[in-house]
A protein has these predicted regions:
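Generic anion/oxyanion-binding catalytic loop in active/binding sites
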Residues: 10, 79-82, 116, 179
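Surface-exposed, flexible loop/turn segments at secondary-structure boundaries
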Residues: 11, 42, 181
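Aromatic-flanked redox-active Cys/Sec active sites in thiol-based oxidoreductases
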Residues: 5-11
Length: 211
């Protein structure tokens, strides 16, 4: 099974969905390849948002409490990082990690740094420390980001997501080309969605202008 996972590091639904997806695939025993597709909710120079003091967002995030409990994710909903960071550099770091065989580990580390440990993933120093934790050279990693080694690649990827895939929001998940819509992000729901790729519902996600 080929899975395309469109996401952003500051989207709480994305972390929960990725963990539910992994567990569901494990239970199904499906041979699946997951391709991550970057999508920036707040691309520069758009003004960053304060999710921490936004009561509407807090209320929306409550749907994640039960799946977080089931998946053993101690997430801060939302994390106390004000304003919410841009994610361009984090994605550039991901491309570096992919080139050095640590893409998946880096992805997991960035999500957890933001939503569990409340670290500012918009800062190169934070990203470099995460890179080192997954076995990458923090010095070369920092140099790559400062030199913009992956800036154009990241820009093209986000442009592709916006102009070709055109997701309503993130996460957007395609299984063998068919879009999955999720309501509550539980493992059970993900199992149902994967078993029937036509499964859909109203869905909850982070849109371009809100999350």
């Amino acid at each position: 099974m080929e899975i395309l996972f469109v996401s952003d590091y500051v989207c709480p639904y994305c972390l929960v969905a990725k963990e539910a997806l992994r567990r569901a695939l494990g239970k199904l025993g499906v041979d699946a390849h997951i391709t991550d597709q970057p999508y920036e909710l707040t691309p520069e120079p758009k003004e960053r948002v304060d999710t921490y003091h936004d009561q509407r967002r807090r209320a929306n995030y409550q749907i994640l409490e039960e799946p977080c409990r089931q998946l053993e994710l101690d997430m801060k909903l939302p994390p106390k990082i004000i304003p919410r960071p841009y994610t361009q550099l984090a994605f550039e770091g991901w491309y570096y990690a992919c080139d050095h065989g640590r893409g998946e580990e880096y992805n997991d580390s960035v999500y957890r740094a933001y939503f569990i440990r409340e670290q500012d993933i918009g800062e190169i120093t934070v990203l470099a420390a995460l890179a080192e934790q997954v076995g990458l050279d923090p010095g070369d990693f920092t140099k790559a980001l400062e030199e913009g080694r992956y800036t154009e690649k990241e820009r093209q990827a986000v442009q592709y997501a916006r102009e070709v895939l055109k997701p309503q929001g993130v996460p957007t998940i395609y299984a063998d080309g068919k879009k999955l819509s999720l309501n509550d992000y539980t493992e059970a729901e993900m199992l149902q969605a994967l078993n029937d790729a036509s499964f859909s519902g109203p869905g909850h996600f982070c849109g371009p202008d809100g999350c």
